């Protein structure tokens, strides 16, 4: 499998997500803590999968997902706690 990008500010979540993606065959997932940095990295590298773990320190995270869908060919997974999901409605 190709490369994966994890956009998440949570250290424990990052380790867990990276370990699961590695088990699935993704090579060394890249971990980015902010939406702004994630957008920059998406223009510099090709990723097969992008996982956004919301919220991010500089934004909620759905904006990164929309940007990824519009500007990359990667699959996108958006993780959000049920209690925070209402912010998207």
Where are these regions (language model features)?
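Conserved phosphotransfer microenvironments
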Residues: 48-72, 84
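Two-component/phosphorelay signaling modules centered on CheY-like receiver
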Residues: 11-30
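Alpha4 helix (beta4-alpha4-beta5 surface) of REC/receiver domains from two-component response regulators
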Residues: 19, 62-63, 80-89
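Acidic, metal-coordinating helix/loop segments flanking the phosphotransfer/catalytic sites
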Residues: 18, 31-49
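Conserved acidic carboxylate
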Residues: 7-9
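Proline-centered loop/turn at the N-terminus of a beta-strand
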Residues: 75-77
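Negatively charged, flexible loop motifs adjacent to catalytic sites
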Residues: 13-14, 34-37, 57, 82-87
């Amino acid at each position: 499998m190709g490369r994966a990008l994890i956009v998440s500010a949570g250290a424990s979540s990052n380790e867990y997500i990276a370990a699961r993606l590695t088990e699935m065959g993704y090579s060394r997932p890249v971990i980015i803590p902010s939406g702004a940095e994630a957008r920059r990295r998406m223009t510099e590298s090709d990723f097969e999968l992008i996982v956004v773990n919301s919220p991010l320190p500089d934004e909620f995270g759905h904006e990164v997902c929309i940007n990824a869908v519009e500007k990359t060919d990667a699959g996108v997974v958006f993780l959000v706690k049920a209690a925070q999901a209402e912010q998207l409605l």
